[in-house]
Swiss-Prot record:
It comes from Mus musculus (Mouse). Residues 1-23, 42-70, 153-175, 294-411 are annotated as: Disordered. Residues 46-57, 352-363, 382-394 have a biased composition (Polar residues). The gene is Smarce1. Component of the multiprotein chromatin-remodeling complexes SWI/SNF: SWI/SNF-A (BAF), SWI/SNF-B (PBAF) and related complexes. The canonical complex contains a catalytic subunit (either SMARCA4/BRG1/BAF190A or SMARCA2/BRM/BAF190B), and at least SMARCE1, ACTL6A/BAF53, SMARCC1/BAF155, SMARCC2/BAF170, and SMARCB1/SNF5/BAF47. Other subunits specific to each of the complexes may also be present permitting several possible combinations developmentally and tissue specific. This is SWI/SNF-related matrix-associated actin-dependent regulator of chromatin subfamily E member 1. Involved in transcriptional activation and repression of select genes by chromatin remodeling (alteration of DNA-nucleosome topology). Component of SWI/SNF chromatin remodeling complexes that carry out key enzymatic activities, changing chromatin structure by altering DNA-histone contacts within a nucleosome in an ATP-dependent manner. Belongs to the neural progenitors-specific chromatin remodeling complex (npBAF complex) and the neuron-specific chromatin remodeling complex (nBAF complex). The lineage of its organism: Eukaryota, Metazoa, Chordata, Craniata, Vertebrata. The modification Phosphoserine is found at S265.
Length: 411
């Protein structure tokens, strides 16, 4: 009898009384009801986790896996549970848990970070332990034994189904388990065989030329359709961006062309204006300015001289008029003092004037002398006007003096 490994479950004790002649009984207990005895009535073979029906096939239990790391809140709860329980001995468990939950919510992020760090560290260790657990000989042996048991159960179910079709009895008696044969599935020989097969399988996978694809790199059909749609949308967007870039490039080239054209036109205009520039001779300009000033001075002197001459002529023309006014005043005085004498003198004057008039009309020489005086006055007026227009003076010309009648000249 081989030694049982530590991970193997303890064997089921054999029943005290066997009743092979009674169909349907597996392990008879005289103190139990017949309906609660271990019957095998053709149900699902998986309903019995430990011992199956009449074949005695057992499904082994897996070895104990590593303990999962505690969550940060559970770590904090374990740490402060005794303290809260001691301070509140009369409270119930759920009330204490409520208090601890409020304390956890009141903690700052820095205080919670300590428990989070511990949890993350233990989680990394747990993942490593799970990898070692899945690769351990005990777990591999459990997998092999479980697969064999499931295969045997399937075979038994097929046989039972065939018996039912052939009309064989529905119930069968489960045979008693032999403690000596219980360890055959977990013997050292089976463990060594499983380890040997595992090692050779790993070596063949490592040394094989085929590359094992990563599960994350496997692309499903739905994912492929989504990726195709994304590629199409990206291509459309790329074409749109390329069209926008072409438009921007065209606008830039147009602006650049206009800028260059304006620059060329400006340079040409500047060259033309530089070619048309006149050299300035300051001496010549100074001489022209002096000449213009001299001419302006001469014109000013001429205008002043002409103005003085016009004033003299106006004064000379005004003197006979003043004499006439004075004579008229004296005549009025004489008429007032001697009215009779004035009448006589008036008659004589009228007679003389008539005689003079007859003489003036009869003698052509007097007419010619009068016409010459008028012509001379007109010539003087035209000469004055010509001199005034040539000098461009702003002075107003004096009107030509009226010709003096011959009677007044004689007086």
């Amino acid at each position: 009898m081989s030694k049982r490994p530590s991970y193997a479950p303890p064997p089921t004790p054999a029943p005290a009384t066997q009743m092979p002649s009674t169909p349907g009984f597996v392990g008879y207990n005289p103190y139990s009801h017949l309906a609660y005895n271990n019957y095998r009535l053709g149900g699902n073979p998986g309903t019995n986790s430990r011992v199956t029906a009449s074949s005695g096939i057992t499904i082994p239990k897996p070895p104990k896996p590593p303990d999962k790391p505690l969550m940060p809140y559970m770590r904090y709860s374990r740490k402060v549970w005794d303290q809260v329980k001691a301070s509140n001995p009369d409270l119930k468990l759920w009330e204490i848990g409520k208090i601890i939950g409020g304390m956890w919510r009141d903690l700052t992020d820095e205080e919670k970070q300590e428990y989070l760090n511990e949890y993350e560290a233990e989680k990394i260790e747990y993942n490593e332990s799970m990898k070692a657990y899945h690769n351990s000989p005990a777990y591999l042996a459990y997998i092999n034994a479980k697969s064999r048991a499931e295969a045997a159960l399937e075979e038994e179910s097929r046989q039972r189904q065939s018996r039912m079709e052939k009309g064989e009895p529905y119930m069968s008696i489960q045979p008693a388990e032999d403690p000596d044969d219980y360890d055959d599935g977990f013997s050292m020989k089976h463990t060594a065989t499983a380890r040997f097969q595992r090692n050779h399988r790993l070596i063949s996978e490592i040394l094989s030329e085929s590359v094992v694809p990563d599960v994350r790199s496997v692309v499903t059909t739905a994912r492929m359709q989504v990726l195709k749609r994304q590629v199409q949308s990206l291509m459309v967007h790329q074409r749109k961006l390329e069209a926008e870039l072409l438009q921007i490039e065209e606008r830039h080239q147009e602006k650049k062309r206009k800028f260059l054209e304006s620059t060329d036109s400006f340079n040409n205009e500047l060259k033309r204006l530089c070619g048309l520039k006149v050299e300035v001779d300051m001496e010549k300009i100074a001489a022209e300015i002096a000449q213009a000033e001299e001419q302006a001075r001469k014109r000013q002197e001429e205008r002043e001289k002409e103005a003085a001459e016009q004033a003299e002529r106006s004064q000379s023309s005004m003197a006979p008029e003043e004499e006439q006014v004075a004579n008229k005043a004296e005549e009025k005085k004489d008429e007032e003092s001697i009215p009779m004498e004035t009448e006589e003198t008036h008659l004589e004057d009228t007679a003389e004037s008539q005689q003079n008039g007859e003489e003036g009309t009869s003698t052509p020489e007097d007419k010619e002398s009068g016409q010459e005086g008028v012509d001379s006055m007109e010539v003087e007026g035209t000469s004055d006007s010509n001199t005034g227009s040539e000098s461009n003076s702003a002075t107003v010309e004096e009107p030509p003096t009226d010709p003096v009648p011959e009677d007044e000249k004689k007086e």
